[in-house]
């Protein structure tokens, strides 16, 4: 993948807290943000004393190149947002313009932190389904706006392999959202949960206090029954349906 094929879009710490139900006691946990892109989550979580590593293919490039790509693509992103405001749940006086401003602010915060954070090892180039980390490196892995959302581009097999890989490096995984780009519940969701159950993992769908895209207000929480227990894909049981 080349940089000119990527449309960078970043979210802020408040978004991550709400999407993944992150609390103050999570500051003590070792976090992995998978597919974070130009989000300010790492910068602000780290500034507050938290421990987090962000992983994304875009981190192959320096700040100047990423910043130039954001400058080139963000006007079109905003234009599309204004062209289809019905996709967004805008309440309490919020507007598409205000939402776009939040995204822009988050990306500028990322760019200011990225050089220092990169040298500190907080930003690592890479992506699913093969992670460059040792087993049990993290306590919690979060992944936003990648799995399930792009079900037309990422196969069921990719989803299953990616989540099992996240479970290899972290005892718990949280994924948001569970809808596709059209706003419907992803067709991959229950087959993925079945595969995870067969592999020995537990999963639960959690309603969160966050809904920017209509219908996108659920997170999938996946965890190993015991942090030291390996997850091995098998082929027998039906998944538990937990809500």
PLM region spans:
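A short, conserved alpha-helix within the catalytic core of class I
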Residues: 150-165
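A short acidic, Gly/Pro-enriched loop at the edge of an enzyme's catalytic core
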Residues: 129-141
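Class I S-adenosyl-L-methionine
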Residues: 181-227
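Conserved beta-strand signature within the Rossmann-like core of class I S-adenosyl-L-methionine
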Residues: 170-179
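A short SAM/SAH-binding and catalytic strip from SAM-dependent methyltransferases
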Residues: 139-154
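Class I S-adenosyl-L-methionine-dependent methyltransferase module
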Residues: 47-121
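Class I SAM-dependent methyltransferase Rossmann-like catalytic core
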Residues: 1-28, 63-65
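Conserved class I S-adenosyl-L-methionine
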Residues: 26-37, 45, 52-56
């Amino acid at each position: 993948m080349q940089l000119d094929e990527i449309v960078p879009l970043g979210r802020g710490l408040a978004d991550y807290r709400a999407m993944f139900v992150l609390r103050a006691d999570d500051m003590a946990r070792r976090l992995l943000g998978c597919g974070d892109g130009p989000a300010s989550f790492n910068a602000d979580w780290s500034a507050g004393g938290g421990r987090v590593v962000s992983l994304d293919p875009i981190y192959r490039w320096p700040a100047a190149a990423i910043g130039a790509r954001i400058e080139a693509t963000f006007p079109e992103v905003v234009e599309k947002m204004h062209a289809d405001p019905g996709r967004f749940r805008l309440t309490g006086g919020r507007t598409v313009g205000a939402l776009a401003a939040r995204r822009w602010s988050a990306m500028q915060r990322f760019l200011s932190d990225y050089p220092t954070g990169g040298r500190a090892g907080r930003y690592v180039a890479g992506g699913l389904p093969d992670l460059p980390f040792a087993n049990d490196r993290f306590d919690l892995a979060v992944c936003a706006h990648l799995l399930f959302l792009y079900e037309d581009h990422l196969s069921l097999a990719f989803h299953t392999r990616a989540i099992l890989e996240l479970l290899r490096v972290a005892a718990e995984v949280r994924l948001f959202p569970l809808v596709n780009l059209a706003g419907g519940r992803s067709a991959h969701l229950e087959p993925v949960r079945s595969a995870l159950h067969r592999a020995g993992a537990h999963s639960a769908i959690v309603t969160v206090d966050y809904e920017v895209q209509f219908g996108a207000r659920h997170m999938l929480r996946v965890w190993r029954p015991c942090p030291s227990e390996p997850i091995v894909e098998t082929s027998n049981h039906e998944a538990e349906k937990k809500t």
